[in-house]
Amino acid sequence: MAKSKKKSSGTSSNVIALNRKARHDYFIEERYEAGLVLEGWEVKSLRAGRVQLNEGYCLLKGGEVWLFGVHLSPLNTVSTHIHPDPLRTRKLLLHAKELRKLIGAVERKGYALIPLTLYWKRGRVKLEIALAKGKQKYDKRATEKEKEWTRQKERLLKVHKFTRRGLPALAGRGIGILRKFVVFRQKSM
């Protein structure tokens, strides 16, 4: 009897690099998986995890998608007759249908293609790119406030452990305290 394999796309063991800054600076609308055209020394560097996606971006040129600004540091063991360029532009491989969709979407004002995650899939390097719209400063502040509010709610719920039986003396009043806090919080926003 054959063992069943579970699908794992982008699990922590397969992830090479993440662009954490992208989720802070952009509203992510659509995601796409793209292959990369790489040289041999680049694959070896990726296996060593020597890549930075933070400053990366994608552009459409001549009906193709190109990756710019991704720094791939060469290993010290690279051959002497090869002169590696760490900031080389790399071609992304997408289906024609996805390319047509992206060409129309990127031409709209305010939209950009940004790299999110670089990972291994069946022995090949894949890049998750996103069609995203840039956030304004006030949008970033609003998301920070929302994150802080959810943290505070979690703290309050953790402090007052609510169970059906054996409630502590404070837990009975804890729900009222939480409601008052929520009402106060909504008035202040």
From Swiss-Prot:
Gene3D superfamilies: 2.40.280.10. GO terms for cellular component: cytosol. Pfam families: SmpB (PF01668). Keywords: Cytoplasm, RNA-binding. It is found in: Cytoplasm. InterPro entries: SmpB, SsrA-bd_prot, SsrA-bd_prot_CS. GO terms for molecular function: RNA binding. Its main location: cytoplasm. One of its GO terms (biological process) is trans-translation. Coiled coil: none annotated. Belongs to the SmpB family. Required for rescue of stalled ribosomes mediated by trans-translation. Binds to transfer-messenger RNA (tmRNA), required for stable association of tmRNA with ribosomes. tmRNA and SmpB together mimic tRNA shape, replacing the anticodon stem-loop with SmpB. tmRNA is encoded by the ssrA gene; the 2 termini fold to resemble tRNA(Ala) and it encodes a 'tag peptide', a short internal open reading frame. During trans-translation Ala-aminoacylated tmRNA acts like a tRNA, entering the A-site of stalled ribosomes, displacing the stalled mRNA. This is SsrA-binding protein. It comes from Nitrosococcus oceani (strain ATCC 19707 / BCRC 17464 / JCM 30415 / NCIMB 11848 / C-107). The gene is smpB.
